[in-house]
Amino acid sequence: TLITEVSPNVVINAAAYTQVVRAERDQELADKVNHLAVANIAKACESIDALLVHISTDYVFDGKALSPYRENDTPKPLSAYGTSKLRGERAISSSGCRYVTIRSSWLFSEHGENFMKRILRNATNQQTLRVVSSETGCPTYAPDLARAIVLCLEKLKDCHSPTGLY
């Protein structure tokens, strides 16, 4: 694999199948990207002793909590997307590789299509915005997540076997 050929010290996996609604129709594709590919990345990282930083999601939970989720809360995904992401997390934790899994939610930036850009676009154009009322989330600015990953790596650089879920 490319990972074993290049042999990096750290691999950051931010790739994911994130189309939540489409994942219900194409569960096999969501599972291939969010679980099986992640399992292969973890296996490659384990073989070269690279640290895997994996970006996951709050969709591994059922969304019924009245307070923010914590790392040790029991996952209970309600969607194919959430299930595929949880399967990826579990593949990593059972792979034997050194890893840090970060659960983010509602990732946004000025690039790409995302919920926050849709809200701003509709507000600017004075268009009605239709959204579900059953979801609560905490938007995460992508550059803030990137800075948090860098800080995490700086804190862990002297720790030989960092493993954790954040």
Residue spans of the language-model regions?
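NAD(P)-dependent short-chain dehydrogenase/reductase
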Residues: 90-151
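Hydrophobic residues in well-ordered beta-strands that form the structural core
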Residues: 53-54, 101
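Glycine-rich phosphate-binding loop signature in dinucleotide/nucleotide-binding domains
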Residues: 4-7, 47-48, 159-160
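NAD(P)H-binding glycine-rich loop region in Rossmannoid oxidoreductase-like domains
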Residues: 1-33
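Catalytic helix-loop patch of NAD(P)-dependent Rossmann-fold dehydrogenases
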Residues: 25, 32, 36-40, 60-102, ...
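CheY-like receiver
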Residues: 2-6, 44, 91, 148, ...
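A recurrent short beta-strand within the Rossmann-like NAD(P)-dependent oxidoreductase core
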Residues: 128-130, 134, 156-166
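A short helix->loop->beta-strand "cap" motif at the edges of active sites that frequently abuts
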Residues: 47-51, 97
